[in-house]
Amino acid sequence: MAVKIRLKRMGAKKNPFYRVVVADSRYPRDGRFIEEIGTYNPIVEPVQFKIDAEKVQKWIKNGAQPTDTVKSLLKKQGIIE
């Protein structure tokens, strides 16, 4: 099972917000997921990004791969190098 840490799109048309989830890479983007570990709202100023750093470290240690977008958000927060 290839596990990814990725964004799940929520909200309305032209007004998205995202949940940061751990999901099998074979599942649809907005489909089933294993665990929700945070939220990301790019619309508000300043941008809101809340995430449970301990859960991120646990999942990465267990082999989960963050997507490029999530990886850049985690680097900005200083959670990963």
Swiss-Prot record:
Q: Which GO terms describe its molecular function?
A: structural constituent of ribosome
Looking up InterPro entries in the UniProt record yields: Ribosomal_bS16, Ribosomal_bS16_CS, Ribosomal_bS16_dom_sf
What's the superkingdom here? Bacteria
A family per Pfam: Ribosomal_S16
BP terms from Gene Ontology: translation
Its cellular-component GO annotations read: cytoplasm; small ribosomal subunit
What does the UniProt keyword field contain?
Ribonucleoprotein, Ribosomal protein
Entries under PANTHER family matching the protein: 30S RIBOSOMAL PROTEIN S16 (PTHR12919), SMALL RIBOSOMAL SUBUNIT PROTEIN BS16M (PTHR12919:SF20)
Similarity-based family: Belongs to the bacterial ribosomal protein bS16 family.
Name by which UniProt lists this protein: Small ribosomal subunit protein bS16
In its UniProt entry, the species of origin is given as: Ruminiclostridium cellulolyticum (strain ATCC 35319 / DSM 5812 / JCM 6584 / H10)
Q: What gene is behind this protein?
A: rpsP
